[in-house]
Every structure is written in structure tokens, then in C-alpha cells.
UniProtKB/Swiss-Prot annotation:
Similarity annotation: Belongs to the arthropod phospholipase D family. Class I subfamily.
Cofactors named for this entry: Mg(2+)
Catalytic reaction equation(s): an N-(acyl)-sphingosylphosphocholine = an N-(acyl)-sphingosyl-1,3-cyclic phosphate + choline; an N-(acyl)-sphingosylphosphoethanolamine = an N-(acyl)-sphingosyl-1,3-cyclic phosphate + ethanolamine; a 1-acyl-sn-glycero-3-phosphocholine = a 1-acyl-sn-glycero-2,3-cyclic phosphate + choline; a 1-acyl-sn-glycero-3-phosphoethanolamine = a 1-acyl-sn-glycero-2,3-cyclic phosphate + ethanolamine
Identification of the protein by name: Dermonecrotic toxin LdSicTox-alpha-1
The record's free-text note on cofactor binding: Binds 1 Mg(2+) ion per subunit.
């Protein structure tokens, strides 16, 4: 079988406290906006 990874991204995580929120919602990757 050709297995591929599935990414559930937490989009626009802009504060440390949001990481736990997105992970608790099922995210297994985090995307941040840095400026």
C-alpha cells in the first residue's frame, strides 16, 4: 500500500497559548506567521 502522511495544520498560530488549543482540536502540525 502507498501510505502518505496526513497533515492537520493549525493555521495562523500567533501566540504560545494557541498551540495547546490547536493540538487539542486535533492539529498535528503548526503554521505560524512571523513578521
Amino acid at each position: 500500500a502507498n501510505k502518505r502522511p496526513i497533515w492537520i495544520m493549525g493555521h495562523m498560530v500567533n501566540a504560545i497559548y494557541q498551540i495547546d488549543e490547536f493540538v487539542n482540536l486535533g492539529a498535528n502540525s503548526i503554521e505560524t506567521d512571523v513578521s
